């Protein structure tokens, strides 16, 4: 199970950053707990932070960041170990529409540049309509609709 878990990244709605750690340390933590070497940690952390546009914030603490920046740190932490699958639970739920679209661009770029599969839960119909990605609609734990190039549709529910 632990080997499979290492191929999975998770992004939470509420960021789940460690408040007493810097941006760099928050992202590095994901590699430290699996025993990665210091040199490998540095390279991977800086790459992940560059991919989310926060390489210039490595010394900042979470309370010095905006909501969008905190979510990008959470995404960097989730991708730092190059997962094959990224699960995102309402990653834009705490953000305004502009920041939400910035986060969606970051996730789209990760999918395109790293080849990471992204599964995202959202109730934001604007994101669904703008992204036009595959959409699976669940109701009471059951699949009720699937769309190849999804748009939000109340009738599908």
Residue positions per predicted region:
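ABC ATPase NBD coupling module
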Residues: 1-9, 38, 113, 155
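Short coil-to-helix segment of the ABC ATPase nucleotide-binding domain corresponding to the Q-loop/switch region
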Residues: 21-29
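Conserved ABC ATPase signature
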Residues: 61-65, 69
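Hydrophobic anchor residue at the start of the ABC signature
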Residues: 75
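Conserved catalytic motifs of ABC-family nucleotide-binding domains
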Residues: 82
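Catalytic Walker B motif of ABC-type/P-loop ATPase nucleotide-binding domains
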Residues: 86-89
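Helix N-cap at the start of a conserved alpha-helix in ABC-type nucleotide-binding domains
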Residues: 97-99
């Amino acid at each position: 199970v632990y080997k499979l878990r290492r191929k999975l990244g998770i992004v939470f709605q509420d960021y789940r950053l460690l408040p007493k750690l810097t941006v760099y340390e928050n992202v590095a933590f994901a590699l430290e707990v699996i025993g990665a070497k210091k040199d490998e940690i540095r390279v991977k952390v800086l790459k992940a932070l560059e991919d989310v546009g926060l390489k210039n914030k490595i010394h900042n603490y979470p309370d010095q960041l905006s909501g969008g920046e905190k979510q990008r740190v959470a995404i960097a932490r989730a991708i730092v170990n190059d997962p094959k699958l990224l699960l995102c639970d309402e990653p834009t739920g705490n953000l305004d529409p502009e920041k939400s679209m910035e986060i969606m661009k970051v996730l789209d770029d990760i999918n395109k540049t790293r080849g990471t599969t992204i599964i995202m839960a959202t109730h934001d119909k604007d994101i669904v309509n703008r992204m036009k990605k595959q959409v699976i609609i669940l109701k009471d734990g059951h699949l009720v609709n699937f769309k190849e190039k999804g748009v939000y549709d109340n009738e599908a529910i």
